UniProtKB/Swiss-Prot annotation:
Record's keyword terms, sorted: ATP-binding, mRNA processing, Nucleotide-binding, Nucleus
Family annotation (InterPro entries): Clp1, Clp1/Grc3, Clp1_C, Clp1_C_sf, Clp1_N, Clp1_N_sf, CLP1_P, P-loop_NTPase
HAMAP family assigned to the protein according to its UniProt record, in alphabetical order: Clp1
Location, primary (coarse class): nucleus
Organism annotation: Candida glabrata (strain ATCC 2001 / BCRC 20586 / JCM 3761 / NBRC 0622 / NRRL Y-65 / CBS 138)
Name listed for the protein in its UniProt record: mRNA cleavage and polyadenylation factor CLP1
Pfam families: Clp1 (PF06807), CLP1_N (PF16573), CLP1_P (PF16575)
Name of the encoding gene: CLP1
GO cellular component, one term: mRNA cleavage factor complex
Amino acid sequence: MAEVEALPGLKQPVDDAGLLEDANQVHTLVIPSGHIWRVELSSDEKLSLKVTAGIGEIFGTELANNVEYTFWDWKFGIYAVEELEIEWKCPQLHDRELSIVENTTAHNVYNLHFALEKMRSSTFDGPRIMVVGEKNTGKTALCRTLCSYAIKNKPYQPMFVNLNPVEPIFSPPGCVTAVPISSTLDAQLPRWGETMTSGATRLHGKQPIIKNFGFETIAENRSLYKLVTKKLFETVSERLQNDSLVHRSGCIVDSPPLENCDDEYSELVEAIVGLRINYLIILCNDNDKGREIYTKVSKIVNTYVGERLLRVPTMAGVFEKDDVYIRAQQRAAIREYFYGDTRTVLSPYNLGCDTSDITVWRPKSVLQGENTNLDTLEVAPVDSSTLQYALVAITYASRKSDSEEVLQAPILGFGLITELNEKRNKLKILLPVPGRLPPNAMILTSFRYLE
């Protein structure tokens, strides 16, 4: 027994062996068929579990039996397709009441999946669906599940498109992305998996198409958002046209929350037109608010999708994501881009250079009082208040390119300005790979990361 010194008069014996035993204590949980174990973990909580009997899945990805999975800093659900027995250990969860709820929307998801399968098998033009809804309705969960189901038993490669810059999926935050889902998604990662830049990984890495928006909310610059998504739509359409397997597999599009769109839902309309969406799925419950949302959306999109607007209830077991959780996920995505995670450790390169060696552009924001020429860039001042700890997108455009060329250029990758000395005109920038600093223009994002 060790004794911990505290405030005078407050000495409490602590059983070190007991603490260690509690941390490694294995618990057994049986989840009834058709139910979800809702798991909520903070950044300092680690859950290890192993399926010992039954069939369970996380967002459509089946968990292998007798394989240990590790989770942290995530809110997710484990669905028991049939009665599921799990061995788990997590000292922080030990004293909590576990949340197990019935999956009341499983049949809706299955019906959608089988309808999409029928379309893929009956025509060369695969289904192009977009999921819309308000925050915390399960849009991303439904998209991920449908992608996982599509590749489970057939050699399909559906194109997943993320139009919500808040969600860092296969990219740092502030991006809109598209990626053909050709293999199993990593059930342990909220960001769906790892990309080809992570090197050797246990699961096949994905190669996403990434367009940098740079802001968290669409409202900060709607003109720029529409310009960036238009470029994404063009690239996705070209890929669908040139890849017959992806074309037949179709598109699954995760839209930004309805609250983030303008009153006319013009962002949704442009996505419907740009990606030639033929089915729109709206997540809302059958109550007064849900019917009001459905009516408003249907009036606006009726011209484009007609009767192919489907109402599906809000996904069962969905979590509410507050700002603290969202910031934690964005921070984790930036960290993993440069450093990897506990299973795939990366070694970024910290490079020193003169401030005169870089040219950083920044988009305008209505939150800063900008109201004109919002779809153009301006040169950012090279000072600590602007660039310190900033995430920057490195473009293919040269440093001498003008605003329009930089805005239209594809993204080479991302860098993180870790230090800036204004007196010496020196800075340090973290890059994913070693080598010289590319002589390319950079675009400042609104995201910061401090170790």
